[in-house]
Each structure stands twice: as C-alpha cells, then as structure tokens.
C-alpha cells in the first residue's frame, strides 16, 4: 500500500543554519542537496510545497543593529541574505528534477519573480516548489513572521518549522536536565510562557488564522517525510487548549 500524505499543501520554514557551512556560516552545498532530497521525497507524495528560508548563516540583521548599523538597513541586508539562500535551495532542488520558483518580496527581477499571491498559488497548483525570499519586504519583521504570513496567504494546511532540536521544551534542554518536551501546546501558552518558538507577531498571526505549526528536527534524516505522512514527531502548536508533555 502506497504511503499517503496527511497534508495537501505545506510551508516549510528553514533557518539559515540548515544550510550553514563550517562555523555555522556560509552555504554548505551538501546540506542544500540533502534538504532537496528530503523535499523531493515529500513532493513525490503529491504534496504542494512552499519554503521560507532565513539568512542567519550569512547575515543577522539584529546583530548588525547591535553593532551600530541602522536597524532598518541591517534588516534589509538580512533580507538580501535570504535571497542568496533561496537561490542555493532552488539550484539544489532543480538538480533533483523539481520545478522551482523563487518569489522575492524585494524586487530583483533578473534573478527572482516578485511576490504575487495569485501567481504563487498557481505555481503550487502546478506542483512547483515555491521559495519565498526577501522576508516580508519590510524591516522589523522576522522570517518566522514571513512564514506565517505566506502560509496564511497561499492557504497552507500547516507550517513545518525545521530546527536543530526535536521540539519545544519546558526549558533549554542543554542547560536543564529536567527539561521536558511538549508534544502539544497552544499558541497562547507558547506566548505566555515565552518559549521562543517564534516571535509573538508570527504566533499571533497563526493563532488568529488557525494555522498550526509543528516544530521538528530537520537534521534527522526522514523526519520531514514522517511528519507529512502523519507520524507524531516534534511539537504541535495550535489553538487547542490541550497541553501534552511526553517526558522526553
């Protein structure tokens, strides 16, 4: 019996570190190709896939702002970094035979389409991978907020937030041996407990539009496909008030 996908259309939020090379800087092409392979496995199930990628492996706008660069300027620099990452992912995906489009919130027409919601939806319907770059196009907004906004705009079923940890914990598991992992928690509890899943703007947008988020470990091979086919992996964040801790 063929494996069936639980979702029809998903948005995968990748941090820049998912592509990072040595010292968590730059782009490791091996990581890009590994991600592309996992994306293809999910695409082959018939799932429509959108991506948002951060730029922290190249530039972190908040760090530049702390170093004295004007915050808006620093954020624009960070947005340009996301475009570089998007192009790297596009190249890797196309080498796996996937049709891909990069849509940027900042006009850069020689290398990416401008973001147009209807066009993005049409690409997804035609089974193209759509990579959203350039953030929201405005400073002071994170790429997590971009992911929330785009997922709502193009009608995704869920946001899969790919991280280096296997879910959301009651405390930092690297610092607290007693930290336990949530298997499920509500948006409001995430905000109230300051669990740093996403910034409050991103979480509020998801909460208001009933857009569930699953936080999972992207570095464990097979997790992405397992999630999409319905396995209980990571932490589900939704409007459900039911809080579950798995004790891990």
UniProtKB/Swiss-Prot annotation:
Keywords: ATP-binding, Cytoplasm, Kinase, Nucleotide-binding, Pyrimidine biosynthesis, Transferase. GO terms for molecular function: ATP binding; UMP kinase activity. It is an enzyme of class 2 (transferase). GO terms for cellular component: cytoplasm. It catalyses: UMP + ATP = UDP + ADP. ATP binds at residues 13-16, 56, 60, 163, 169, 172. Its main location: cytoplasm. Catalyzes the reversible phosphorylation of UMP to UDP. PANTHER family: URIDYLATE KINASE, URIDYLATE KINASE PUMPKIN, CHLOROPLASTIC. This is Uridylate kinase.
């Amino acid at each position: 019996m063929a494996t069936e996908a639980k979702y029809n259309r998903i948005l995968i939020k990748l941090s820049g570190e998912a592509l990072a090379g040595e010292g968590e800087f730059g782009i490791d092409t091996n990581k890009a190709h590994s991600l592309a392979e996992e994306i293809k496995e999910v695409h082959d199930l018939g799932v429509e896939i959108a991506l948002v990628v951060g730029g922290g492996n190249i530039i972190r706008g908040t760090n530049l702002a702390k170093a004295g660069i004007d915050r808006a300027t620093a954020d624009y620099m960070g947005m340009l970094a996301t475009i570089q990452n998007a192009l790297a992912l596009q190249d890797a995906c196309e080498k796996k035979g996937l049709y891909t489009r990069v849509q940027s919130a900042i006009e850069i027409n020689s290398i990416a389409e401008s973001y147009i919601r209807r066009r993005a939806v049409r690409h997804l319907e035609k089974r193209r991978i759509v990579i959203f770059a350039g953030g929201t196009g405005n400073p002071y907004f994170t790429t997590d907020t971009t992911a929330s906004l785009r997922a709502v705009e193009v009608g995704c079923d869920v946001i899969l937030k790919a991280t280096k940890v296997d879910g959301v914990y009651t405390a930092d598991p690297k610092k607290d041996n007693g930290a336990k992992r949530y298997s499920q928690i509500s948006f409001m509890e995430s905000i109230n407990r300051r669990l740093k899943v996403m910034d409050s703007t991103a979480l509020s947008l998801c909460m208001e539009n009933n857009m569930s988020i699953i936080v999972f470990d992207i570095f464990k091979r097979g997790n992405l496909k397992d999630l999409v086919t319905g396995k209980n992996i990571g932490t589900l964040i939704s409007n459900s008030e039911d809080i579950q801790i798995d004790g891990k």
